[in-house]
Amino acid sequence: MLKEIFVQTYYPTVKEAGLKFKINPVVLLAQIAIETGWGESRLCMDHNNFGGLTGFGKPTDYWPGTKIQLSEKSLTFRSYPDARSGIFDMARLLRSSYGNAC
């Protein structure tokens, strides 16, 4: 995905998530760009997972608990129903795990 298209596609949702979780949306957008290779990762394209988030933990408001495994020996990863859910769960995780850094 072209970088410009990535920004145009995801920035509105990132901005909304940034406001909700009190994270600078530019920082959040940069983080998901790095994590997904500008939207090119299989987890992002096929499963709306914007941070390589593993399938551990309890379901959240944004993740219904769906897990996928990319290969027989890989970890399980979270699969989201849509991009908004994946971005919001990434922001939630950043805020809850790294609150002072955000």
Task: Name the predicted role of every residue range.
Residues 1-102:
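Catalytic cores of secreted/periplasmic lytic hydrolases that degrade extracellular macromolecules
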